[in-house]
Amino acid sequence: MAREVIGTCCVQSLQMNDIRHNNASIKHFVREHLGCACPDEVFENISATEQSDIFSSASTVYEIGGRLFVAVFVPADWLDMAGHLGKLVEAGKQFRDQHGYNRFRMVIATEDNDAENGLRRIFNDLPGIDDKTHLHVIKPGLLPW
């Protein structure tokens, strides 16, 4: 099976650090900034991993309690990433479904105020978007690291 890497050229490289593995920070981030209403027991098992497949351009991928799959991207330029949004969302949905997660939340962190409207418009026009697939465009300062 061939692996396809999407958008690696447009993503800033971030060093892994201890805060990414701090369950309390991740729980706060997911609940307060992504609007997740999962019960407390879901947050007892959180893994933060660097992906080597299609999500290699993600800064971090969280797998939370066997229910929630969150891919966090911090692009150098969200416009470069916008061209790959459809493939990334589709890959996230497939990963969610193959691994039995209830939700896929794609997070794009950028300082650009135009990103929310631009990315939301592209996301809303994608075929097959369901109520278990979410896009969050946030400021990098809200990330849990």
What do these predicted regions represent?
Residues 6-68:
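N-terminal, charge-rich interaction modules
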Residues 31-40, 58, 123-145:
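Charged, structured surface patches that assemble and position nucleic-acid processing machinery
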Residues 44-55, 78-86, 131:
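Phosphate-binding glycine-rich loops and adjacent basic patches that engage nucleotide phosphates
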Residues 64, 99, 128-130:
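A generic structural signal for short, non-catalytic loop/turn and secondary-structure boundary residues
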Residues 65-77:
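Active-site ExK catalytic segment of metal-dependent nucleases
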Residues 70-71, 106, 135-137:
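Generic structural hydrophobic/aromatic packing signal, biased to beta-strands
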Residues 74-126:
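Amphipathic protein-protein interaction modules
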